[in-house]
Structure formats: C-alpha cells, structure tokens
Amino acid sequence: MSCTWPNGASSFGTGWLFGPNDVATAAHVVYSQENGGYPSSIIFYPGVNNSGSIVGASYKATIAVLPATYQSERDDTKDYAFLSLNSNIGNTLGYLGWATSVSVGNTMALTGYAGEHAYELWEGIGQIKSTSGSFLRYTADSSRGMSGGAIYLTIQMKAAGFNHGGYPGESYNYGVKINSSIANEMNYYKNKN
C-alpha cells in the first residue's frame, strides 16, 4: 500500500483485506501530522513481486475509520484504521477473518513488505508473549514497511491485531489487539458495503 502526502512525500506500509472491499492497517500508515495529516492518495496493491511489478491491478483506497484520539494525541492504543477500496476484490481474492481470543504462547506470524527488502513479501514467525491491555507483544521480526500487517494466529489463520513495530524498552514487537469493540467496528464496516 502506498501513500502520497500533501507535502509531496510518499511512504508505504502493509494492509490486509477483511471484507470484500475492506482493508485494515495501522493508523500511522495512513495518517501523519509531519506530512500534512491525511494522504492525498492511497493505493492498495494486492501483491508486488520482487522486481517491483504489481501482481494484478492496483486499487484506490479511502479512509473509512481512523480513531480521533489517534489523530489528536497519537494514542498508540488506537493505532488502527479501516479503508474502503473502489472494487470488491475480496470476493475474488478472499479475506482474513479475525479473533478476539489470544493466549500467551500462541504461534503467530507477520507478513508485509519490509522496507529494506523493497517489493519482497517477508514473513516473521514467533510467539505471543503478552496479551495484557490494548496490545499484543510478540517475538516475530518486523521491519519498517510491515506496519499495518495482520498479527495472525497460524493455527486459526485469523488476524488477532494490527502490527505496529518495536515496543519501547523491550526486545519484542507489538501491535493493537483486536478486542470486542474493534471486532464490532470491523463487522459493521464489512457488512456496510
């Protein structure tokens, strides 16, 4: 997923389909006070090969949900966003379900387009180390560009959260956990379109 910002900067991150035209990602992928707030354009690519060629088509995305407290306070407990695509590609490609029940020790994985390996899909596999509060902490490797990717449980093959990155003062990575409130929002937007 690539963003072009009002100040002319560009960036990329990872998102994942959770409905026919619904994409989940991290809020910090699609909102940046430093770059002018909201992106002037967001393009979603279902896949990119290692030569930089887009696999399939690209799709225009618009922000459907971005928590207000993330915008005003950079509240990391609200570091998630939902986007709407201009096509129901999930009906063809499929999409991830999600889970609100996660246990310490569950095997999990992250996939995304790591910044130092541009145009290559990378996966990190690890274990859930903590489920307390609003976050999941885990041992899977993450890198710039993988932000917004699903924290998915490998046995259930369901998303349990949104990858953020390194946890301050720890060797673990972390992301926002899909709790019942976020799951309700996801159900609402998935069924709205």
Task: Describe these PLM feature segments.
Residues P20-N21, V104-T107, G133-S134, I155-A159:
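Loop/turn elements at helix/coil->beta-strand transitions in domains of secreted/extracellular proteins
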Residues D141-N163:
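Catalytic nucleophile loop of clan PA
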Residues M1-I43, I128-T131, L153, G175-V176:
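Catalytic histidine site
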Residues S2-T4, F18-P20, A26-V29, Y45-V48, ...:
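Active-site-proximal beta-strand/loop segments in catalytic clefts of secreted hydrolases
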Residues A9-F12, I54, Y119-E123, M157:
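Short, mixed charged/polar active-site loops
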Residues A160, H164-N193:
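C-terminal cap/linker of serine protease catalytic domains
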Residues C3-G8, F12, Y31, G37-G90:
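Conserved catalytic-core segment of clan PA serine endopeptidases
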Residues N50, A61, D76-M146, S171-N179:
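Chymotrypsin/trypsin-fold serine protease catalytic domain
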